[in-house]
Amino acid sequence: MTPALTITRSFALASCPSRRPRPGELLLWRLRGEWQMMTSEQGHLCLSKAELRRARMHPNRAHGRRFAIGRAALRAILGTLAGRAADTLKLIERDSGHVAVADCDRLDGIDVVVGYAGIWIVIAIAEGPVGLGMAQDSAFADPLARNRLRLDSLTDACGIGHGATPRSLERSAEPFREVVTPYAGNWCLLDIPLSGPACAATVAARHIARIHAAGWRGERGDWPTVGKQRARTAGSLNVPESVAAG
């Protein structure tokens, strides 16, 4: 079944869910590598000393700035979901961009992953495992290469033992697909719209029934046809509009 989709143009946290995701819900944010959700001063104030050091000492200055923007946004989002100040959260780094929140009962059992490609920052949050495959590569025009990125999202969610192959994903050309892996059960894969040269991303989760997407401003080509309907963005008042497809 194709998931329902809510797209919010605004980056304001008030326009996004203020609670942890329910089973089957996927929360997505797309940000540019610039201060959109808050000012630079506000963002740096909520970062930990280790995060500030990581941003400032990064060998690539642009990537260090992008990390600071993404981490500050993540703290603001998780603080909203947890009902706590962003700078009080204790974040634990895991593998491949995954982040856990320590000592926070309200966020127990959710998975958080942050990905980067070109100018884009994507944050995905769900209850249970979630994976993100995201990169900038001109090869993604090739269907097999695109399927490898989809496979990366699956591996990011459940590890390498799923047994799926890029060719096993060729049966569907839709941006949303449900796949059955030989060894890891059923998974949902969603291609995330990213404008710009050769950027692509796919998110994987065990079950996706509803998607809340923030930061997509209706650029042409965003959110291609899902099932038989096209996702629509919310109006100028930034009130989310839900579109059930399928």
Predicted regions and their residues:
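Core catalytic alpha/beta fold that binds nucleotide/phospho-ligands
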Residues: M1-G246
